[in-house]
Regions:
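Short acidic (Asp/Glu) and glycine-rich catalytic loops that position anionic groups and cofactors
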Residues: 42-43, 80-82, 114-118, 141-148, ...
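Catalytic phosphate/nucleotide-handling subdomain of diverse soluble enzymes
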Residues: 86-128
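Amphipathic alpha-helical interaction segments
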Residues: 32-36, 60-63, 82-85, 101, ...
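Glycine-rich phosphate/pyrophosphate-binding beta-alpha loops
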Residues: 68-99, 172-174
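C-terminal charged capping/lid subdomain of soluble metabolic enzymes
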Residues: 126-214
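Carboxylate- and glycine-rich phosphate/diphosphate-binding segment that chelates Mg2+/Mn2+
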Residues: 1-75, 185
């Protein structure tokens, strides 16, 4: 399997699980499978990235992906998928890549409205607090060259294109299931944060570097 396919699908599965858990439609069944999925995927995703022939880790990743599918089928995804779909349609990019690009910024936007749930996710992954969650996803993206793979898109993300992307995102599924329902302008800010992140080459990124004026 090409490394990019592993990366895109694994990060999409992790997003399925996280979004299912923070969805406004979350329930006992989706919560159970979402937490199991987050645990399975987070424990094995980097092993699979670093050792692609590790069949046991791949099996655990597959099980986690299956659990994540059950979870979001019962509670839905939200803003990372809404914005990711818009990005994919506009630039003809793989779905998993687009969702991975958007997810860190969506968590930053939604954090306060679902703090306790994000806190539980951080604990499952083994992070020392919710404020590390976006950085954890950013680092996964960096290791798998997700940011680098989309850098050529940065100059194409003009303000006009971002307006179109925001409208497209608002017209699809995943808006009302987000704990914090975004306005058109707030989605534009999220896309501008993505643009700014893609303009930063290499190194560890401090999240304040990606902030833009609202």
């Amino acid at each position: 399997m090409p490394p990019s396919v592993t990366s895109f699908t694994a990060l999409d599965a992790l997003t399925h699980a996280i979004e299912a858990f923070v969805s406004t439609k979350a329930n006992a069944m989706s919560d159970f499978y979402a937490k199991e999925a987050i645990s399975c995927i987070s424990k094995n995703i980097e092993t699979v990235f670093e050792h692609p022939n590790n069949i046991e880790a791949r099996q655990q990743l597959l099980i986690g992906s299956f659990y994540a599918g059950i979870a979001f089928s019962n509670s839905s995804t939200n803003l990372a998928h809404a914005t990711g779909r818009a990005l994919g349609v506009k630039f003809h990019m793989p779905h998993g890549q687009c969702v991975a690009l958007m997810h860190p910024f969506v968590i930053q936007y939604s954090l306060e409205s679902a703090y306790e749930r994000y806190e539980e996710i951080a604990k499952i992954i083994g992070l020392n607090g919710t404020h590390f969650l976006s950085g954890y996803l950013d680092e996964l993206n960096r290791k798998q060259h997700i940011w680098k793979s989309a850098q050529q898109m940065a100059p194409l993300l003009t303000d006009e294109v971002i307006e179109q992307l925001a409208e497209q995102a608002l017209s699809g599924n995943g808006i009302l299931t987000n704990r914090k329902v975004p306005s058109n302008e707030e989605i534009e800010v999220i896309f501008k944060q993505l643009r700014k992140r893609l303009q930063i080459e290499g190194g560890i990124v401090e999240w304040q570097q990606c902030q833009v004026e609202k």
